[in-house]
């Protein structure tokens, strides 16, 4: 990779150097990534890590303990430091969402790994209610195909409309030796007659959602999503 994880944790480290504490919520799409991020946090010596996912039934007690310490901290006591790592699936649940959004909106850093996941479904509906002002979104593929509305909301949430987004292209990464050079070897796979007919029929139905003036889809609804997935399956199953 190009170092997205390390870059974001260095931002958290900088907050620690300036203020003497670290406070972060890290959102990830899978349980595997929860564990990977925990390992990376430990490398930065962020040791107070709480994992919020189905395999950790004690997470709520740990989070409530942090809430208690922050609420009743004496002026001469040090700030509580912590990193909370949650899957998107857990975070969007009502009780979890309310519990994890009760921290200081000015102190806590929100890191969203594979942040394009935030632009759809229940996560998209939650964006407006996430209070934290420090936000970092990480993604190698931030723009969602055929989802202009989701892309707009995501850019607005992370301040990309105000040019606060840093882009590091694959071309630049290869040129600087961060990524290895590689060669493409296309393997042509042709659709059967039945597959092609189904593909064309789905494409015609999808085209009805397309705005010729803007060359885009105004809004991604469930009907369009199902059509796109059905067409995608035809390509993926082609032999």
Where on the chain are the PLM-derived regions?
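A short, hydrophobic secondary-structure junction motif
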Residues: 37, 116-117, 163-167, 239
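Post-DEXD/H (motif II) to motif III coupling segment of the RecA-like Helicase ATP-binding lobe
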Residues: 120-181
């Amino acid at each position: 990779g190009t170092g997205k994880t390390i870059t974001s944790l260095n931002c958290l480290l900088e907050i620690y150097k300036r203020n003497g504490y670290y406070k972060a919520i890290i959102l990830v799409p899978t349980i595997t990534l929860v564990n990977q991020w925990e390992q990376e946090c430990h490398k930065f010596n962020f040791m107070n890590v709480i994992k919020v996912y189905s395999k950790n039934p004690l997470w709520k007690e740990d989070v409530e303990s942090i809430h208690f310490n922050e609420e009743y901290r004496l002026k001469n006591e040090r700030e509580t430091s912590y990193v909370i790592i949650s899957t998107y699936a857990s975070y969007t649940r009502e009780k979890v969402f309310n519990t994890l959004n009760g921290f200081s909106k000015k102190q806590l850093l929100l890191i969203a790994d594979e942040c394009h996941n935030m632009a759809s479904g229940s996560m998209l509906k939650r964006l407006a209610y996430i209070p934290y002002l420090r936000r970092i979104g990480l993604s190698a593929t931030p723009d969602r195909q055929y989802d202009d509305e989701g892309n707009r909301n995501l850019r607005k949430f992370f301040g990309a409309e105000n040019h606060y987004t840093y882009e590091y292209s694959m071309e630049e990464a290869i040129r600087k030796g961060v990524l290895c050079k590689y060669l493409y070897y296309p393997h042509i796979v042709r659709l059967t007659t039945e597959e092609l007919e189904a593909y064309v029929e789905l494409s015609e139905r999808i085209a009805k959602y397309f705005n010729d003036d803007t060359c885009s889809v105004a809004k991604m609804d469930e009907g369009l999503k199902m059509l796109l997935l059905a067409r995608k399956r035809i390509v993926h199953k082609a032999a």
